[in-house]
């Protein structure tokens, strides 16, 4: 009885193990198609590396000499093979192999033999070294790799270079103050300074020739000695015209400084002395000097402040010009600055002729105008009879009325004392 039970248990155990193995195999077979995109050793495609070709034959000859590739042989062989994972794989492999063959036959580099080159030519074969060897006047240097190169740049040591120190003369000529200082430093008036500046400006060879180079370069190495620059003549003409204009301005300034008397031409060149000399040389304006008579006046506007203005009369054009400068003391300190809208009106009386009004200046207790007012058609007789009325008003905002700050009438003869 015990043997029968043991046999039955062994049969049950064996049937259970067989069923489990069959279930695992079924699961694997059912899960197989789900993971078909996983790359396994049996799914790796064949790769093709094109061979090195000794020469560049034509495409047909190259394909005939090389023969079919390994992948093409595998595709063409009728023997047993694995089923392809994709129906497009054979056509894709064939097209890739053909494109690789075409690329291999097309890109062929011809290399010359190394025995044809000498040691010096092989060292200085690059364009930079060849350019350095073509300039015999510029000093050479050798790099750590044995290549020949220039010890310094051939452009920054020439007279025509913008970085050269002598080109500071152009900057000094461009500023009138520098020209006056250089002219005043000369002991013999201003002729020496003007001749020096004129020579520096009017001799284009100082800037357009390589003969005066510090490195002693020849005409062949100079960039301006090349016949390719056929437009340099027009450049020279324009340069000469600008130079003549600058020289004439410099001569005029030098002549003004040289025309001073012996007692005025002191070595003191401070700004205060120059202002005193100009004030002494300037004549008083009047009818005999040919200048328009003018004068600045401060007009009191009653008890509230004043207005500063400048009057000038041009007899040749019969025109009176009044420049309104500023107004002062018209507003008290407690007044709100946001309500200030100052405006000045001008006219000629009697008759209120040629009424004019200034710009409204806001938010300022001391407004500054600096405006010009012109009164035309005034002969000398009319100027002696008419007067100028000045009316200062604070313009009201929104519904507020204008506020009169001051009004005054001045005869034109008091504004123009030279009439």
Curated annotation (Swiss-Prot):
Residues 186-196 have a biased composition (Gly residues). Residues 212-225 have a biased composition (Polar residues). Residues 1-96, 115-136, 151-225, 247-300 are annotated as: Disordered. The modification Phosphoserine is found at residues 259, 261, 270. The keyword Magnesium does not apply. GO terms for cellular component: cytosol. InterPro entries: C2_dom (IPR000008), C2_domain_sf (IPR035892), C2C4C/C2C4D (IPR043549). Belongs to the C2CD4 family. This is C2 calcium-dependent domain-containing protein 4C. It comes from Mus musculus.
């Amino acid at each position: 009885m015990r043997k029968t039970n043991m046999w039955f248990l062994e049969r049950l155990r064996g049937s259970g193990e067989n069923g489990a193995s069959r279930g695992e195999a079924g699961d694997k077979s059912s899960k197989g198609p789900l993971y078909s995109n996983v790359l396994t050793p049996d799914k790796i495609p064949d790769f093709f590396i094109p061979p090195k070709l000794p020469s560049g034959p034509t495409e047909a000859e190259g394909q005939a000499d090389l023969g079919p590739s390994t992948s093409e042989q595998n595709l063409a062989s009728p023997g047993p093979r694995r089923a392809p994972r994709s129906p497009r794989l054979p056509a894709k492999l064939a097209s890739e192999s053909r494109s690789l063959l075409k690329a291999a036959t097309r890109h062929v580099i011809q290399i010359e033999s190394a025995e044809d080159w000498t040691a010096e030519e092989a060292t200085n074969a690059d364009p930079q070294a060849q350019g350095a060897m073509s300039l015999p006047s510029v000093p050479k240097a050798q790099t750590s790799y044995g290549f020949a190169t220039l010890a310094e740049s051939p452009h920054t040591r020439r007279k025509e270079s913008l970085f050269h120190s002598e080109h500071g003369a152009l900057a000094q000529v461009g500023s009138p103050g520098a020209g006056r200082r250089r002219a005043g430093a000369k002991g013999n008036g201003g002729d020496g300074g003007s001749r020096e500046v004129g020579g520096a400006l009017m001799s284009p060879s100082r800037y357009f020739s390589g003969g005066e180079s510090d490195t002693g370069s020849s005409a062949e190495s100079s960039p301006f000695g090349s016949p390719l620059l056929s437009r340099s003549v027009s450049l020279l003409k324009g340069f000469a015209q600008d130079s003549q204009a600058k020289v004439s301005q410099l001569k005029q300034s030098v002549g003004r400084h040289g025309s001073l008397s012996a007692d005025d031409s002191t070595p003191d060149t401070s700004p205060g002395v120059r202002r005193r000399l100009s004030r002494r040389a300037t004549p008083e304006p009047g009818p005999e000097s040919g200048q328009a008579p003018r004068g600045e006046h401060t007009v009191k506007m009653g008890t509230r402040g004043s207005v500063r203005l400048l009057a000038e009369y041009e007899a040749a054009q019969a025109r009176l010009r009044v420049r309104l400068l500023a107004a002062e003391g018209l507003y008290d300190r407690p007044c709100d600055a946001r309500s200030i809208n100052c405006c000045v009106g001008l006219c000629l009386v009697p008759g209120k002729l040629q009424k004019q009004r200034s710009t409204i200046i806001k938010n300022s207790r001391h407004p500054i105008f600096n405006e010009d007012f012109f009164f035309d058609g005034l002969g000398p007789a009319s100027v002696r009879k008419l007067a100028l009325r000045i009316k200062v008003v604070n313009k009201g905002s929104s519904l507020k009325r204008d506020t009169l700050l001051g009004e005054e009438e001045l005869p034109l003869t008091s504004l123009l004392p030279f009439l």
